[in-house]
Amino acid sequence: CSQSRGLGDVYKRQDMYLSDVFNQSLKILGEKDLVFEAWQYHHQINQVAEIADRNEDLTIILNHFSGPIGIGPYEGKENEIFKVWQKDIKELSKRPNVLAKLGGLAMPVNGFKFHEQETPATSDQMVEKQKRYYLECIESFEPSRCMFESNFPVDKQSISYHVLWNFFKKISENFSEDEKNSMFYDCAKKA
């Protein structure tokens, strides 16, 4: 089909979520009671809020914390990026039709550099570097609208599968059993 495009085109079109064709497609998903899983970079969170506002009957799942970038021109700006990301996540979480999928921060694009280590990251290293993203999302969206996700096999370059799930247990240790059930099972089932 002449209208189909490759993955590379997605990266060239930073405003794709705002196009009429894209939003017509989202309307169809909502009509069919399907979900839209959104993955974009941190500077595009406001576009997810816009499509959530335009499509209130559509469940949108925010993937990978909306991809906070930590490489290239963003390298070394972790705290600056986190502050902007935090503000935008708080605003996005006001949309009841948006759920948060918690995981996928072990990718090289996020700049934590776990993939460069001699051995895969430990759960304690993950807690040290990423805890603030997890806790901010859980606080903003509340546990009932959050679900842990592995993002395997992509995360395999940085962390082992069982260590990742141990990390999730450490992140959630101070939450109630009901809240843990939401994040480990109920929210995903609801979606």
Regions found by a protein language model. Give the residues of each.
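A generic alpha-helix preference that emphasizes hydrophobic side chains
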Residues: 7-8, 26, 97, 177, ...
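Single conserved hydrophobic/aromatic residue that forms the stacking wall/gate
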Residues: 1-11
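Catalytic pocket-lining loop regions of alpha/beta-barrel enzymes
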Residues: 15-147, 158
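Conserved Rossmann-like nucleotide-binding pocket used by diverse enzymes
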Residues: 3, 61, 184
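Mid-to-C-terminal alpha-helical segments outside catalytic/metal-binding sites
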Residues: 132-136, 140-147, 154-191
